[in-house]
């Protein structure tokens, strides 16, 4: 997974953002110009169109972004399910643990678990008011 932190952010400077996947990630970059390319656009990034491996460059400054790349083989007549994991954690260790936990779960199971967690949170307070 690709982890990022902005210590200069006033509200969330201590937090760690992450981008991971349910499948192996083969290369990453945090350099927007590498991904988009000199004459590319966000709709047609040169790294994707050229099938290029990303450099692994992760540095502060410039124009950052988060890009992870994977090579996926789809068999003729087949299908492949891919899940992208985008989140936030208190520490890098917690971010890595979240990615590991959710990487191994089936998407439908993750969705059901998420709905159950939100229901538990949202259903705790019920307010009734007179008309």
Protein language model features and the residues they cover:
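Trp/Gly-enriched beta-strand surface patches
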Residues: 1-76
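Terminal amphipathic helices with adjacent charged low-complexity linkers/tails
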Residues: 88-111
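An acidic-aromatic substrate-binding cleft motif
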Residues: 104-131
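Residue-identity detector for glutamine
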Residues: 5, 46, 100, 109, ...
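Short helix/loop capping segments that flank catalytic or ligand/cofactor-binding pockets
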Residues: 12-13, 27-29, 82-84, 91-96
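Short Pro-Gly-centered flexible turn/kink motifs
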Residues: 72-90
């Amino acid at each position: 997974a690709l982890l990022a932190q902005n210590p200069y952010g006033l509200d969330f400077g201590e937090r760690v953002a992450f981008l991971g996947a349910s499948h192996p990630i083969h290369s990453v970059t945090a350099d927007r110009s590498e991904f988009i390319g000199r004459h590319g656009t966000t709709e047609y990034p040169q790294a994707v169109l050229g099938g290029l491996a990303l450099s692994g460059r992760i540095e502060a400054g410039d124009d950052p972004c988060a890009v992870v790349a994977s090579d996926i083989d789809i068999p003729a007549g087949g299908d492949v399910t891919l899940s992208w994991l985008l989140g936030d954690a208190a520490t890098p260790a917690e971010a890595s643990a979240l990615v590991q936990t959710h990487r191994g779960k089936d998407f439908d199971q993750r969705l059901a678990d998420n709905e159950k967690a939100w229901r538990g949170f949202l259903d705790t307070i019920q307010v009734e008011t007179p008309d």
